[in-house]
């Protein structure tokens, strides 16, 4: 489970914190974010609505915050206990600042609802992914009525109609184009925590992307639980825009130079989507396409809706359209009933397809899902051993891809200072590889060509491309 705070890193707790003394309208907000990019996007929107309504600004120190929010994820095991553990760490701040508001949002909030307040009465607001736009109202009601507020309803796409314009810094941005999931995989809680699939209107998405481009954004990542299931209403028409059509229109927005999207579903990878990789050069040569397993028996038990052969067929079509396409994927190891033979079929699929990265986990039972009722008789040590084998194979493939890039010419979007050395810069290739290199700060936010000189485990090193003579031989 991915975990961030806005400002991207949580602050440590001093032994003698001081109470917050900010006046209304000049306070601060601290958000800790768990989970996927959708949650990161939602956290940014929480800041936007509270900044516009109450003048709050971000802090990376919970001790100076007037509002503390936890944006939670319920995908992994023991997510609820993690939330209560984190809540316990900030409870003492209430005594120091009685006006402090503590809130829980995201998918755990959607699952647990009022049970969070019952167990942790010091929590002031509980809200779901679809009601984050109501945060200012919930906070006001909590302060006016003195009673904790809970709103985990599913008002479909309403939240996007109540969002202030995005305010971004940097050359990249997320744009949520749909919410929820209607696939109901047997292991997954998302349909129960985020609701059914609902797409934003076509023009709304294009307007947001165009506004971001006007602010200097060069790369957008289109977000959705099943992003390629997008079906957006076109204003003044009975026509519905599918995801391929949306990509075609985003591709034409001036200023946008790269388009990414996540997360996609193999069943929704239409022929028109495949053809987009041949026709739309701004669509990057990197795709996250979760497969989960390589055994047809396990895939059927997961209710994924495709076979291993069908998945490989989709990949073949995509790579025919874009030969240099690299893939990442999701894998669940130790799903109930998985045999050694099933696992070896997953390993064969990985060997056949080739992946650059993966998010792979040991199966964890999620209450309320159909898979929770299946007998889970695989010993934990066996699951962990399989996970290690799977990750080792993908790491081997990733290392080979990285090594193959040494000596090649790659176009980067320069995102900012390098995390390894603040005197250097960091950019990202089309296939999502981080490259550290020396260069002037004026390159930040721009595209630049580099020659890859070294490959490491989690990054590449390069130098800014010079003349053709000095770079002779670079592909």
UniProtKB/Swiss-Prot annotation:
TRAM domain segment(s): 403-466
CDD domains per record: Radical_SAM
Recorded catalytic activity of this chain's protein: N(6)-dimethylallyladenosine(37) in tRNA + (sulfur carrier)-SH + AH2 + 2 S-adenosyl-L-methionine = 2-methylsulfanyl-N(6)-dimethylallyladenosine(37) in tRNA + (sulfur carrier)-H + 5'-deoxyadenosine + L-methionine + A + S-adenosyl-L-homocysteine + 2 H(+)
Name used for this protein in its record: tRNA-2-methylthio-N(6)-dimethylallyladenosine synthase
Gene3D superfamilies: Methylthiotransferase, N-terminal domain, tm_1862 like domain
Source organism of the structure: Bordetella avium (strain 197N)
Functional description taken from the UniProt entry: Catalyzes the methylthiolation of N6-(dimethylallyl)adenosine (i(6)A), leading to the formation of 2-methylthio-N6-(dimethylallyl)adenosine (ms(2)i(6)A) at position 37 in tRNAs that read codons beginning with uridine.
EC number: 2.8.4.3
Location in the cell: Cytoplasm
PROSITE patterns from the UniProt entry: MTTASE_N, MTTASE_RADICAL, RADICAL_SAM, TRAM
GO cellular component, one term: cytosol
Positions that bind [4Fe-4S] cluster 2: 181, 185, 188
Superkingdom as given in the UniProt entry: Bacteria
Domain (Radical SAM core): residue spans on this chain: 167-400
Originating gene: miaB
Chain intervals for the UniProt region annotation (Disordered): 1-25
Oligomer and partners: Monomer.
Domain MTTase N-terminal span(s) in chain numbering: 27-144
Composition bias, Polar residues: 12-23
Cofactor field: [4Fe-4S] cluster
Keyword Ribosomal protein (UniProt): no
Biased composition (Basic and acidic residues): 1-10
InterPro entries tied to this protein: Elp3/MiaA/NifB-like_rSAM, Methylthiotransferase, Methylthiotransferase_CS, Methylthiotransferase_N, Methylthiotransferase_N_sf, MiaB_methiolase, rSAM, rSAM_horseshoe
